[in-house]
């Protein structure tokens, strides 16, 4: 028994949705090699087994014991891991720096930031400067390989407690972060003050 089924036609809207889906899939597929280079191997790796003391220390000197930190600590030992983190300038942090490269206000001085914030219709507003600093801080805490350094930056920022929403601090906090806190986070207190 043969039944005749009506042939349904794709509406223009459904055709465009399908075309957009195919185009987006192709675009995402072409990005995979770039993301693989930035993020490394995306396969799930096993956690290294750590003794309770090492695990506690790792949690205190990082923003969370990620797989790569646990494996690195297990590989070289706690003392060597701390020494490596203290010499943070030698740690390759390319993927984090690449993510931060989209922020345009992080490397500007106070006069430039004030000018950016005061200009009308220039693509920036008063919230651009503090928002970029907040986003950059979170990215560094989550993705930087310089975890001890970022913990100390957070400690000193919290200690000196410059409220970013108060007065001129909305742009001066970015300068404080780059020129004072980040520059001296693992240095002497005298240089920091």
Where are these regions (language model features)?
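Primarily short, surface-exposed interaction patches in extracytoplasmic proteins
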Residues: 68-70, 132-193
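Long, amphipathic alpha-helical surface segments
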Residues: 10-14, 32-44, 176-182, 186-193
């Amino acid at each position: 028994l043969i039944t005749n089924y009506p042939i349904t036609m794709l509406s223009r809207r459904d055709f465009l949705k399908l075309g957009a889906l195919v185009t987006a899939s192709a675009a995402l597929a072409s990005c995979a090699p770039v993301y693989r280079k930035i993020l490394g191997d995306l396969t799930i790796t096993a956690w290294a087994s750590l003794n309770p003391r090492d695990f506690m220390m790792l949690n205190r000197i990082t923003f969370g014991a990620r797989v790569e930190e646990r494996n690195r600590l297990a590989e070289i030992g706690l003392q060597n891991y701390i020494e490596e983190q203290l010499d943070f300038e030698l740690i390759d942090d390319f993927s984090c720096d690449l993510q931060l490269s989209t922020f345009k206000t992080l490397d500007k001085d106070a006069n430039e930031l004030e000018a950016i914030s005061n200009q009308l219709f220039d693509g920036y507003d008063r919230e651009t400067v503090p928002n970029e600093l907040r986003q950059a801080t979170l990215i560094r805490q989550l993705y930087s390989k310089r975890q001890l350094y970022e913990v100390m930056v957070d400690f000193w920022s919290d200690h000196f407690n410059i409220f970013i929403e108060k007065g001129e601090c909305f742009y001066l906090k970015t300068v404080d972060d780059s020129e004072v806190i980040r520059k001296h986070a693992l240095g002497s207190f005298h240089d920091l003050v």
